[in-house]
Amino acid sequence: MINEHFERIVKEKFGFDFSPTQQAAMKNFLAFLFDRHPESLFLLKGYAGTGKTSLVAAIVNTLLQFEQQVVLLAPTGRAAKVFSGYSHQPAFTIHKKIYRQKNAREGVGIFNLGFNGNANTLFFVDEASMISMGSQDSNFGTGSLLDDLIEFVYNGRNNRLVLIGDTAQLPPIGVDVSPALEADFLQ
């Protein structure tokens, strides 16, 4: 039905036949997409060169064709630029999207978690392995980028999160594995 139609359009936009792992990822994404649990999260992991970003770009452009709101994010400006280049859609750093500077009386250079005015939106975050739990000394939000990102996304009405990353990449400083790519941790 709609799942098959959606998948067919993604395949057309992708431009190649899916590998077995991409086919499995597509099947799992469709289950996530049509799951109406309000706080569900989709985790897409794969090594470099497996086609994660290309698959997500095809999914994003198909979602836009169906008039689904999407926001594309990445931890760094460079990663956001690459994500935007693949998807042909604007992408932003996580910090730019979720934080707002406090007013001058409260302190210059201090950033609070901003208001999320998005509703019914899928937030896609590429290079999620770079997202850290942070430190208390941070000038941004709670000091935990991952916690702040999750809080920001789910503070909006009917928003959900898709985290994309490579477990073979180095984790954030001070941890052995990237918490943003650990399903057990995210639950």
What are these regions (language model features)?
Residues 1-187:
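Conserved ATP-binding/catalytic motifs of P-loop helicase motor domains
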